[in-house]
Amino acid sequence: PAADAAGSLQKVEVTGSRIEQTDTQSDAITNVQTQGVDEGGIVKKLGDYLIVLRRGRIFSIEAGKSALRPVSSINAYGPGISPGGAWYDEMLISGRTIVVIGYSYARGGTEIGLFHIDEAGKLHYRSTYHMRSNDYFSSRNYASRLIGKQLIFYSPMEVNLYGDSSNSLPAVRAWQQKPGAFKRILPATEIYQTGLSTDGYDLTLHSVTTCDISERSTLDCRAKAVLGPGSRVFYVSADA
């Protein structure tokens, strides 16, 4: 089966700088700007395993011995989901939960995939969530962060002043073969304004969404947002 095709991984090349860690830091943290705040990346470490996100697939590789050994591989998207028009380019790990963040141009939103890695390094699919969002891509930054068991990510929404404004508000739904209704995650009391002058053609709702990660297949999310011009810089600290 495709999910067990670990043998198809013939060669893995990883480049980057070495990051010194203390015994108190999470083993999964391999890419940070701020201590204690993990960033989305394509290579993570969990115990003796390297977890690699590459070309729409997740690979687990045993690295605790004298040689690398492919263990398991799985699609970075759920069963029945077409990867066409989608980019899966960010991965984080909380406990034994692997989170893959992607953007689908075909479905028009952010995809959040939840996977599980067991003690033997085998990968299992759990669930996928679809969040309303415009493209968050930045050549200088990742969109997601992880602090403990809280997933935090940024997503912009262009505000349509001449149509249904509810479609401009952040909302989440669980992926199913027959898509269900979106659940709004941004209350009106959590929308703020910058005070900067802007016109209706450059009005963006910059939302920061926080989701609680657990060993279950569910994802509980809530959002805050700032209304202002399209330009932005995204930064997350451990205590603010």
Question: Where would I find each of the regions flagged by the language model?
Answer:
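Beta-sheet-rich non-transmembrane sensory/scaffold domains
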Residues: 1-240
